[in-house]
Design a protein with these regions (language model features):
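Conserved mid-domain beta->alpha element of the FAD-binding
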Residues: 2-13, 19-21, 132-133, 235-324
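Conserved Rossmann-like nucleotide-cofactor binding loop
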Residues: 3, 26, 138
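Short phosphate-binding/catalytic loops that engage adenosine nucleotides
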Residues: 9, 16-17, 49, 100
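A structural signal for isolated positions on well-ordered beta-strands in alpha/beta enzyme cores
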Residues: 19, 101, 191-193
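Conserved N-terminal helical subregion
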Residues: 37-164, 199, 206-215
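Conserved FAD/dinucleotide-binding core of flavoprotein oxidoreductases
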Residues: 73-92, 126, 164-238
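Histidine-centered metal-chelating micro-motifs
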Residues: 138-139, 158-160, 178-181, 262-263
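C-terminal auxiliary extensions adjacent to catalytic cores
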Residues: 335-356
């Protein structure tokens, strides 16, 4: 994923030997867009892939907020909106250009963090110097090393698709019990995401297919009519949003956690990918300054990241609640404050100004 490839690049650039083990037979991402705000773009610039990614992505300069199909307010933004596949492809290209090794078809079976031994489902095992767990929300590494912390359903599920439809700005539709965000990921394609508040759990998966008919039961057709391409695609997916209990540690013995393996968050402020990028840059920077002393690096990494992680997690959960307000009076006050104050710009600035 994002964190593994980005970490590999930073390690190779600093002459740290590393190898990436990938469960899948190839890197792929279906039906998924990603937004990268200035804090994440700063890391992409350090990876030397920002300009190349911008050239094939959407580069939205404005975000518009709607309620009941009426515009509430808009803000200027400097957000890179693209597909995960585009980002993955460039990260892989960069990592490979540095002589980086990646082994596909290596599904993790077990790990001994005391002996630093990794065991794979294909029968192969390797002894390593340190283990970087970048294996996502269903992290096998985390299950083995942090057995009491299992993913928990957040109460939200999300519909998403990539549409053959042009769009220049980022759009938010706020509604009772749901919200929609859409943004351009290239000149001719748009990412569509609709989040709903529901007690019905859905599997956390990129590949759980849904239908337009089911989507229209969760989201008003009047809003879906703005996205005509939804009616003509079979690539509509639905997945549940899962988080973990309050994060207390980012490492255990000779293993360190990154990205969703460390701190899966709800997607309501678009910081999942950015947080993964911040994680790996911070870790690699500290590792270099500590002359490869991993334990010292782990402690400093955790000290620097935990406060940020908890702030973003709380901000994202609160944003989800604001987006999905049902009470008409509270909706009125929310919209009034958004329209007549600079609260939206202030909140985004607080998140985006951070630099790892």
């Amino acid at each position: 994923g994002i964190s593994g490839l980005a970490l590999g690049i930073f390690l190779k650039e600093n002459n740290f030997p590393c190898v990436i083990y990938e469960r899948s037979s190839k890197i792929s991402e279906y039906g998924a867009g990603i937004s990268i705000s200035p804090n994440g773009k700063d890391v992409l610039e350090k990876l030397n892939i920002l300009e190349e990614l911008k050239a094939i992505s959407g580069n939205s300069k404005k975000t518009i907020f709607y309620s009941n199909l009426k515009e509430i307010t808009s803000i200027d933004t400097d957000v890179l909106t693209t597909s995960r596949k585009n980002l993955y492809d460039l990260l892989l290209k960069k990592y490979s250009s540095l002589g980086g090794e990646i082994l596909f078809g290596y599904e993790l079976n077990d790990v001994d963090i005391g002996e630093k031994q990794i065991y794979f489902a294909n029968g192969i095992s390797h002894n390593v110097g340190h283990i970087a767990a970048c294996d996502g929300i269903k992290s096998k590494c985390r299950q083995i090393c942090f057995t009491s912390e299992m993913p928990e359903y957040s109460g939200y599920s999300v519909w998403r698709s990539i549409l053959d439809q042009k769009q220049s700005n980022i759009s938010f539709h706020l509604g009772p019990g749901f919200h929609i965000v859409s943004y351009p990921i290239s000149k001719n394609k748009t990412s569509f995401v609709a989040a709903i508040k529901t007690k019905q759990k859905n599997e956390e998966s990129w590949m759980l297919r849904g239908t337009y008919s089911d989507l229209s039961k969760d989201i008003p057709v009047e809003i879906l009519n703005d996205y005509e391409a939804l009616k003509n695609t079979q690539d509509i997916y639905k997945w549940g949003i899962y988080t973990r209990p309050k994060i207390k540690s980012l490492y255990s013995n000779h293993l360190t956690l990154f990205g969703d393996a460390a701190h899966p968050i709800t997607p309501f402020i678009g910081q999942g990918g950015c947080m993964a990028l911040e994680d790996v840059y911070e870790f690699s920077k500290i590792l270099k300054s500590n002359d490869s002393q991993f334990l010292k690096t782990q402690k400093e990494y955790q000290s620097k990241r935990l406060k940020r992680i908890r702030f973003i997690n709380k901000a994202s959960m609160n944003q989800g609640k604001l987006n999905h307000i049902n009470n008409p009076l509270l909706v009125f006050f929310r919209n009034f404050i958004m329209k007549n104050t600079n609260i939206v710009s202030l909140m985004t600035r607080k998140i985006w100004e951070y630099r790892a």
